[in-house]
Amino acid sequence: MAISIKTPEDIEKMRVAGRLAAEVLEMIEPYVKPGVSTGELDRICNDYIVNEQHAVSACLGYHGYPKSVCISINEVVCHGIPDDAKLLKDGDIVNIDVTVIKDGFHGDTSKMFIVGKPTIMGERLCRITQESLYLALRMVKPGINLREIGAAIQKFVEAEGFSVVREYCGHGIGRGFHEEPQVLHYDSRETNVVLKPGMTFTIEPMVNAGKKEIRTMKDGWTVKTKDRSLSAQYEHTIVVTDNGCEILTLRKDDTIPAIISHDE
């Protein structure tokens, strides 16, 4: 399937969907504290998406996924299923991954929350993971190959003593939740996509404190690090512009501009 180039009208709708997804993460922040269940956080997010934003969660029912957001704690790499029995505790690192649909278009984003008092490793892993995403975002412009971006993420992460998960990647996005291209966060000879203005996709590195290997739990969704080391992830949805990119899911706590341009 070809990579779709979005029209200005499409991009405007994606700005709206992206802003809504970012707002869910901004809204949930004060609720992420020791003693709260991931099931409760999911309900708060779902109520906000449905009743305040008048939007739809793309995750709910996607391939049978039972909840509205993914909440992944500590050694859980991704796709953690919210559960009333799963309570957050001091020092946990928690990824909340939100995808909303508004007016037919998707906005997909995730960030790490540190519960209560951070551990040194947890804080460092989260910081390096976010820095790897920012490094990638600053590289995006027409004419660059996605392979260069994946290689740069891998080099940066491994220089810090961490590893990049291979099995999951960023993806094209728009009317579809997962479109072409695949956006790998490591160097691969199979990647050969030259960026053009109007392409929309996510960059979402998953970084493990230990080794890169993962395993999927019996529920068929929850993915953990094989060595039980901590794992972190940050994700933004972006559009390639004529001279860089625009981040469609920027939050108030982000420390990178929404529009990155490479004009001389």
From Swiss-Prot:
Changing residue 178 to A: Reduces activity 9000-fold for the Co(2+)-complexed enzyme. Binds only one equivalent of the divalent metal cation with affinities identical to the wild-type enzyme. Transmembrane segments: none annotated. Pfam families: Peptidase_M24 (PF00557). It is an enzyme of class 3 (hydrolase). It catalyses: Release of N-terminal amino acids, preferentially methionine, from peptides and arylamides. The keyword Metal-binding applies. GO terms for molecular function: ferrous iron binding; initiator methionyl aminopeptidase activity; metalloaminopeptidase activity. GO terms for cellular component: cytosol. Its EC number is 3.4.11.18. Coiled coil: none annotated. The keyword Transport does not apply. GO terms for biological process: proteolysis. A divalent metal cation 1 binds at residues 97, 108, 235. PANTHER family: METHIONINE AMINOPEPTIDASE. Belongs to the peptidase M24A family. Methionine aminopeptidase type 1 subfamily. Removes the N-terminal methionine from nascent proteins. The N-terminal methionine is often cleaved when the second residue in the primary sequence is small and uncharged (Met-Ala-, Cys, Gly, Pro, Ser, Thr, or Val). Requires deformylation of the N(alpha)-formylated initiator methionine before it can be hydrolyzed. This is Methionine aminopeptidase. The gene is map.
